[in-house]
Amino acid sequence: MLLDVAVSPDDRYVLTADRDEKIRVSWATAPHNIESFCLGHTEFVSRILVAPGHPELLLSSSGDRTLRLWEYRSGRQLHCCHLTSLQEPAEPWGDKRFAVSRITYWRQEDCVALLCDSLPVVYLFQLDAPRQQLVYRQQLPFQHRVWDVAFEEGQGLWVLQDCREEPLVLCRPVGGQWQGVPESAVVRRVSAHLRGNWAALEGCAGGDSGLSGLYKATCDNMTSYLKRKEERLQQQLERKRRRTCPPGPAGRPRR
């Protein structure tokens, strides 16, 4: 089951993200020929993105709550960030399973933004290409569930959230930290358009992403097995007791 697709900038390779924990790199002219596999995720691979400006590097995310950096032609993993290690203990979703539903990239500063399914937060990283690693920068918290995020060159990070009164937030780096900027004429105009089509937007963007149903099923068979075993033993003991206690004169078991 394919969950995402990317094409290398030179159009030589097709990259596919799989529910079965792997990323496959195939030749575009002959997709049955596999160049490499990127292996390491322990859950479904939700999103992949070839880093703009760095055609040899691939970003991937997964239901295992990691962001990974690859040299995809060789299938070599360069770096892995565990998102759970970035969470504060007091955050209400600290123990919740989540997957990244969007990866977006700002080429101007090699900035990576991650949107996690159902969480009111956006994670920000910086790609250090010379050192082949991802550097965590900050979290952007929001009061409402975030539906989508996208960078616009020359503008900043657009954040679409589940709030009819304030559906759109524009964030920019200020003093080295990203933050929401005062509402501009552009934000007001686009927000007014979104409010006018809120029912359609809510039905589309506000729906379930479907990622929650992709996790591997884990069954605690031991508990049910032991219960059934105990029931069988009790039944066997009952049958044995009945066989060893023949009925008395009145048809009742002897005591």
What are these regions (language model features)?
Residues 28-31, 72-75, 128-130:
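Short loop/turn segments that connect beta-strands within beta-propeller blades
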Residues 1-28:
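Fungal eukaryote-biased detector of long internal structured cores
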Residues 14, 57-58, 112-113:
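Acidic/hydrophobic-patterned starts of short beta strands in beta-sheet-rich repeat architectures
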Residues 6-11, 49-56, 104-109, 151-154:
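Loop/turn segments within WD40 beta-propeller blades
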